[in-house]
């Protein structure tokens, strides 16, 4: 079975002032505080969440 690539995602901007929908997406990714990092699998659903909220995140592959 092939191992999925992972993406390193860091929250770099505050959620204050962000759209409610974007706040919910960020929380769904497991990010709560600024400068916290999560590793998520490189899937189309994850890429979609990143595209919607890219102005709040730093993404490394």
Swiss-Prot record:
Signal peptide: none
SUPFAM superfamilies from the UniProt entry: Ribosomal protein L30p/L7e
Gene Ontology MF annotations: structural constituent of ribosome
CDD domains: Ribosomal_L30
Keyword Chaperone: no
Description of how the protein assembles with itself and partners: Part of the 50S ribosomal subunit.
Membership in a protein family: Belongs to the universal ribosomal protein uL30 family.
Name the record gives this protein: Large ribosomal subunit protein uL30
Organism: Nitrosomonas eutropha (strain DSM 101675 / C91 / Nm57)
Lineage: Bacteria, Pseudomonadati, Pseudomonadota, Betaproteobacteria, Nitrosomonadales
């Amino acid at each position: 079975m092939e191992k999925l690539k992972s993406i390193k995602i860091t929250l770099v901007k505050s959620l204050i002032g962000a759209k409610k929908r974007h706040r919910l997406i960020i929380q769904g990714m497991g990010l709560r505080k600024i400068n916290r990092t999560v590793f998520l699998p490189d899937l189309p659903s994850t890429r979609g969440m990143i595209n919607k909220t890219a102005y709040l995140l730093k993404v490394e592959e």
